[in-house]
Amino acid sequence: MSVSRRVIHHGLYFAVLGPLIGVLFLVLYIFFAKEPLVLLVIIQVLPLFLLLSITTGAIPALLTCVMVACLPEKIGSQKNYRCLAGGIGGVVITEIYCAVIVHIKGMASSELFENILSGDSLVVRIIPALLAGVVMSRIITRLPGLDISCPETDSLS
């Protein structure tokens, strides 16, 4: 499969599922690390929480998918190396993205958004990015749409 086809396939899944997986792990982290009552507050504002996670997580997830799709065959074909690269890439790309957003200050106009992007909430950004990168890198080859036949190349062989 060509790199461009892998980028498109991975991009759709990473951008949609990546932030949602991150939210799932973040909610579990808050439930077990903090008081469970905090989870009730999050459930009350879950639509805003999901929107915030997608706005802060879709672009890093998309960039992580491009990185995973462009891995050399030797690394990309082995699950463990692909998961390691996806997890590290997810963390690094998310931190770079958040640093750029904080410096631009264009998107960080609200107090809630600014608190999430501040250095105080490093764990809140790193854990979901790491786990979403690992999980998505692990399951991306099993998701439908990867083995799409192309009529132009099928007729040549």
From Swiss-Prot:
Top-level taxon of origin: Bacteria
Side Cytoplasmic, residues: 1-11, 58-83, 137-157
Keywords: Cell inner membrane, Cell membrane, Membrane, Transmembrane, Transmembrane helix
Membrane topology: Multi-pass membrane protein
Signal peptide residues on this chain, from the entry's feature table: none
GO cellular component: plasma membrane
Periplasmic side: 33-36, 105-115
Family membership: Belongs to the CbrB family.
Protein name: Inner membrane protein CbrB
Source organism (scientific name): Escherichia coli O139:H28 (strain E24377A / ETEC)
Gene giving rise to this polypeptide: cbrB
